[in-house]
């Protein structure tokens, strides 16, 4: 897990890991790293932020992260939430919010008689028009690395997020003899549901260090002198009531 304070560049680190793994797979004989990647956001708001960064492979070229002499090796196909594109053999980057994988799960199938039990699930009725779900496309990949954004939402055996990723891992084990290539968690607070930090943290970049390194701004502590707390605060007047506090914070 990567424990990084908010605003210190988790997205940049994700992009660096992806470039390193992808090019290693392409250039190093016998590499066991990934050339397929799944970035998972906890909700649509976080997904939209990731979408802005990764759309059209923007983040990889803006920083820049891809060495010019290796640009010809880069062939990553980007598949965003809602895309129906089929994965490419040259490598893929899926960026989704976890709810989309929930919604696209294959329906459970149970044999209704002995013949069904022997023959298994019947094929799709119209293969020509059939569109594989996001989950089906992800399960079809090999050499898959998962990167969880805001990963404090993930690790609880009862959480659907955790169960979904474990199901993908187990599916890969059954099909290819090995599961996920890597599972990386990114969060400012990578804690379990009981409040303890993940024992697999390998990077710890706290807010105090980020402030000292001038990566983020130092917090401003405002001391009130002779100022009473606002009263009768409602939704319609909250901006007006707290106007002085807002102005001070912005300045």
Language model regions located:
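RecA-like P-loop NTPase motor core of helicase/translocase proteins
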Residues: 1-251
């Amino acid at each position: 897990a990567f424990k990084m304070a908010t605003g210190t560049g988790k997205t940049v680190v994700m992009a660096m890991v992806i470039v390193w793994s992808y090019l290693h797979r392409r250039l190093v004989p016998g590499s066991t790293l990934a050339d397929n990647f799944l970035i998972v956001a906890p909700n649509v708001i976080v997904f939209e932020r990731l979408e802005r960064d990764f759309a059209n492979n923007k983040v990889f070229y803006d920083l820049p992260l891809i060495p010019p002499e290796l640009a010809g090796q880069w062939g990553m196909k980007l598949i965003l939430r809602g895309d129906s594109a089929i994965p490419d053999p040259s490598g893929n980057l899926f960026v989704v919010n976890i709810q989309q994988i929930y919604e696209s799960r294959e329906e459970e199938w149970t044999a209704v008689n002995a013949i069904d039990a022997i023959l298994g699930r019947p094929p799709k009725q119209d293969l020509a028009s059939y569109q594989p779900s996001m989950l089906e496309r992800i399960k079809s990949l090999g050499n898959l690395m998962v990167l969880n954004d805001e990963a404090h939402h993930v690790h609880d055996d009862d959480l659907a997020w955790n169960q979904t990723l474990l199901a993908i891992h187990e599916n890969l084990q059954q099909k290819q003899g090995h599961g996920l290539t890597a599972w990386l968690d990114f969060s400012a607070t990578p804690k379990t549901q009981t409040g303890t930090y993940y024992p697999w943290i390998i990077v710890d970049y706290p807010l105090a260090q980020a402030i000292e390194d001038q990566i983020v701004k130092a917090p401003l502590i405002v001391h009130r002198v002779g100022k009473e707390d606002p009263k009768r605060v409602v939704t319609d007047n909250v901006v007006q009531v707290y106007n002085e506090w807002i102005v001070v914070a912005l300045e």
